Amino acid sequence: MQIIVVGVNYKTAPVEIREKLAFGEAELGEAMKQLAKQKSILENVIVSTCNRTEIYAVVDQLHTGRYYIKAFLAEWFDIEAEAIAPYLRVLEGEAAAGHLFRVAAGLDSMVLGETQILGQVKGSYLLAQEIGTSGTILNHLFKQAVTFAKRAHSETGIGAHAVSVSYAAVELAKKIFGHLNGKHVLIIGAGKMGTLAAQNLYGNGVGKVTVVNRTLEKAKQLAAQFDGEAKSLGELSCALLEADIVISSTGAKGYMLTKEEMAPLEKMRKGRPLFMVDIAVPRDLDPALAELETVFLYDIDDLQDVVAANLAERQKAAALIEEMIEGELVAFGQWLQTLGVVPVIAALREKALAIQAETMKSLERKLPHLSERDRKVLNKHTKSIINQLLRDPILQVKELAAGPNADEALQLFMKIFNIEDAVKAEQRSAQRAEVQLRDEQQAEAVRAARPSWQL
């Protein structure tokens, strides 16, 4: 069994390709169930967001697994396989596992270190677990990846530094005021950048939002998003008297506010600090405003400097997380190796118990006078001998499975005890049991989703 990842993301495919390969939230479960029916696919989890569609699978053979996953994507989205082939990225084995750790931790995201992807990865995994398309290997891998991503964010603080201009304004405002609870925000202009800044400020607990714009109707539309107040441009002076934070993004020719216009208003504000952010190009606010004692003025270049510094901090944190991933891969690899030893141990126990059972039958034939109590005592003690004899070989085979050259070591172990065929039988039995469990889980999910009147 092998782990494989097949898919596209913002690095490998343009948006016009990604949008053609995006699974809707409502169809994701059905897609995973259909993929599970394909040849070679033993387990699968599909992660689909605006920036990526990736299929994580456990396959019995890599080449057939790759083929059927690609064919499934082409058939599901009714697109020629050749049309998407150049954009598909395929990772196998340890590289596939490492990719999931990076995705969950936000290292493979367009915004380095973002946390939204972690929730999306967890949601896909829980859905696959619920409908039965994931199994022993992917359940362990995804659970480990989600747990690791949470720890990585907590220990490195990778998401603590703003890397967008709009959120950098929030970060600076917090440095000046300490907190934003109850602060009055004034938005000058109804442009995209101003809107984003207002959304981030509003999400951080500001009290009131006022929007001033040349067109009052646009001001009303934006203000409505924040239960705020709209004012015309002629009311700017009054709005400035009340504001604690000003975001300006009109891009008009000439300054919307000069030092001379603000100076008398500053006196009327009685020393209250005013945080002003000019994210317009050309600038809206007179740079001389910074000369006023209670005015803290920042422009787009100041914010870009903050973003650049924060991005550098995130990159340092990302480097630490990459080192942490190496340890996670070692741990997962060791677990995966011990998984392969389970049927070996089971086959060894079965052979030993079969010998014990034959020995008991022989004793009963040769000693027919034995009482029922005597038989029970003999059975108990012969089983005890078997368990004691097996203890050291089982401990040793577990160590072999976790060490270097594990496959060769296990093959030699099986040859010594002549259990090669028995191990294969155990593996087939385990696979049948897993398929049966998956089918039962899928059937139960279908029954649960069926309306009560159809039951």
From Swiss-Prot:
Belongs to the glutamyl-tRNA reductase family. InterPro entries: 4pyrrol_synth_GluRdtase, 4pyrrol_synth_GluRdtase_dimer, 4pyrrol_synth_GluRdtase_N, GluRdtase_CS, GluRdtase_dimer_dom_sf, GluRdtase_N_sf, NAD(P)-bd_dom_sf, Shikm_DH/Glu-tRNA_Rdtase. Keywords: NADP, Oxidoreductase, Porphyrin biosynthesis. The active site is at C50. Catalyzes the NADPH-dependent reduction of glutamyl-tRNA(Glu) to glutamate 1-semialdehyde (GSA). The keyword Transferase does not apply. Homodimer. This is Glutamyl-tRNA reductase. Possesses an unusual extended V-shaped dimeric structure with each monomer consisting of three distinct domains arranged along a curved 'spinal' alpha-helix. The N-terminal catalytic domain specifically recognizes the glutamate moiety of the substrate. The second domain is the NADPH-binding domain, and the third C-terminal domain is responsible for dimerization. Pfam families: GlutR_dimer, GlutR_N, Shikimate_DH. It comes from Geobacillus thermodenitrificans (strain NG80-2). SUPFAM superfamilies: Glutamyl tRNA-reductase catalytic, N-terminal domain (SSF69742), Glutamyl tRNA-reductase dimerization domain (SSF69075), NAD(P)-binding Rossmann-fold domains (SSF51735). Its EC number is 1.2.1.70.
